[in-house]
Every structure is written in C-alpha cells, then in structure tokens.
Amino acid sequence: MKKIQIAIDGPASSGKSTVAKIIARNLGLIYLDTGAMYRVATLVALQEKTEDASKIIQFIENHPISFANGKNGQEVLVGLDNVTEVIRTNEVTNAVSKISAMMEIREFMVAEQQRIAQKGGIIMDGRDIGTVVLPQANLKIFLVASVDERAERRYKENLSKGIPTDLDRLKVEIAERDRKDSTRAVSPLKQAEDAILLDSTGKTIKEIVQFIEEKAKKLM
C-alpha cells in the first residue's frame, strides 16, 4: 500500500480537523494538527507576553510540540504540559491569525511539518498545506462552508465544552478571520491549482469523509 500524503485546506471552522482526524483513524494515517501548532505559538506569545518571533521559537524549541493519543482523542503537548483545551479558547483563537502570519514563525513550523511528513502515510489540515507545506501531496482538498454554518458549528462546539459564546459575535469574528487569512502577506489562505473544491454547507461529516476517502483509496 502506498504511503500517501493528504492535504486539507480551508477557512476557519469548515470542518477540516474533524474530517482529517476521522480519515486518519479509518485509513491508518498519522494526523498532524498544523492549526494546533500555530495555536501553541499563539499561546506562548500570550503567556510570555511577547510578539518577538525568535523568543516564541526558542520557547518551543526548549519545550517541543508533540501529539499523543488520549482517552478523548488526540492531545497536544508543549514539553510535558497538556495544552489541548487551552489552545482552543477564544483568546487564542482571536490572536492566532496575527501570530501565524509572522514569517519566522511560519518558516519554523513549515520545516517541522515537512520533516514529520517526509515518511508519508500522513494527513494534514490548515490554511496553506497544499500550496506551501506539502505542494507534492497526492491528494489536496479545499474545504469550504458558509460563514453562518461555520459559526453554528463553532457555537455548538463551544457550548458542549461549557464555553459561553455569542453566535452573532462569532459570525463577525469568523468573517474577519477569513479576511485576515486571505489577505495576509505570508502564505495566505488560497486554493491550490490541483486541489478539489469541496463545499460542506449542508453536508454531514460522514458525507464529507466518504467523499475524501473514496478519492484517497484510489491513490493508495
């Protein structure tokens, strides 16, 4: 069986991570949560009260990012600290575009991601996987959905975690995040020329997973 690389890109809350995790489990692939890596960098920036990219990188080099399978799914570690939940707070979410747009941060993270992906048998999701991180990926998907639907998804997700959230404010924040991600100077959110455009509006997770898995199995 061929060890393929699958890249899933798309805007915030389009379902990338959920879909990628399920496909990884179903097809026996490694799931590399690139978004979580940038959220870690943002968390470090907030906790250390710095926007100095070199200091953020140095902290992460001293406390490496790793992923582990926990009882409730994949866990994100920074050194020995479990940051799975804290990197998903609104404070981190609203600051991640700014930190992830820093050239030095992106170059550091991309190098780390490419190193891990070299062996193949991997699925990654993010904003620039198909265009920058894994331009040679065997299968590229660009997953989109309406702002309203994405806000509803994030709203329900936050409620299930006990995080109080205002739906209308979420819609504004997601639309603004789209604008920032699409217009930033470094690696903007962009569909790769050879990526398959998949609109998930009105579709179930099961339908999206099935579509991508059918494409992937033909390449394995």
Curated annotation (Swiss-Prot):
It catalyses: CMP + ATP = CDP + ADP; dCMP + ATP = dCDP + ADP. Transmembrane segments: none annotated. It comes from the Bacteria. Its main location: cytoplasm. Keywords: ATP-binding, Cytoplasm, Kinase, Nucleotide-binding, Transferase. One of its GO terms (cellular component) is cytosol. Signal peptide: none annotated. It is found in: Cytoplasm. Its EC number is 2.7.4.25. One of its GO terms (biological process) is nucleobase-containing small molecule interconversion. Gene3D superfamilies: P-loop containing nucleotide triphosphate hydrolases. ATP binds at residues 10-18. The keyword Repeat does not apply. It holds the Pfam family Cytidylate_kin. InterPro entries: Cytidylate_kin, Cytidylate_kinase_dom, P-loop_NTPase. GO terms for molecular function: ATP binding; CMP kinase activity; dCMP kinase activity. Belongs to the cytidylate kinase family. Type 1 subfamily. HAMAP family: Cytidyl_kinase_type1 (MF_00238). This is Cytidylate kinase. It comes from Lactococcus lactis subsp. cremoris (strain MG1363). The lineage of its organism: Bacteria, Bacillati, Bacillota, Bacilli, Lactobacillales.
